[in-house]
Amino acid sequence: MCVPGCGGTGKSQLIRAITAYFTQTNRVHKLRKLAPTLVAAAEIESMTIHSFLGEGRNRKKKSKTIDRPGQTKLENAWRFVEYIILDEMSMVGLSLLARLNKLVATAKHCDPMTTMGGINLILFRDYIQYSPVFDKPLYYNFSTTMDNNTTNNRKLSTENEIQQESAPALILQINCVVILEQQMRTKDLAYRALLDRVRNGEGIHEDWLLLRTRVVGIGLHISLNDPPWNQ
């Protein structure tokens, strides 16, 4: 499942509501919340994907967690989990998603062909935000690059490239998309229109003029034509 929406449409509130529902119904042990960054994880009271995978900043040290099907700690962590909320999906890369899929399949003792070990995956946020670092975004299309590489003498794929090329099959399993469109944070119609244009890279001169009026402090007018802003 995928729940996209621009800023201010209530995505974080929805995640909190889902968490509250699982807590009140005594099923919070069936829910896992993950995010690609520490800030995003703190926002929804979750943990980072890298921490959950047992990966530090130096990925040269391979995680021992993923390759041990009989590891009790790993099995206990996922024994009752049925739902994964994956926040900030724009920053989640294909390789990262593939590694998460491998870990869950190992923990659940599932066929590797079973998506996410049979667990329901719910992606949140907005594709039109920060892209993943040193990874391909979830919407990346390999068809063009594969055609080009076929004509050239393509080298053997690395483990990271294999993960990236296999992960799109996971995305294609999404069979439900709920788009959040109602803006809950901003009621100013002109400012909302500005945000929509800037989000899509379609800003106009009037947007710049409007932003110049959003100055903190009464009577404080600063020109962008004056130093140091014009440098």
Describe each PLM feature range.
Residues M1-Q231:
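Conserved ATP-binding/catalytic motifs of P-loop helicase motor domains
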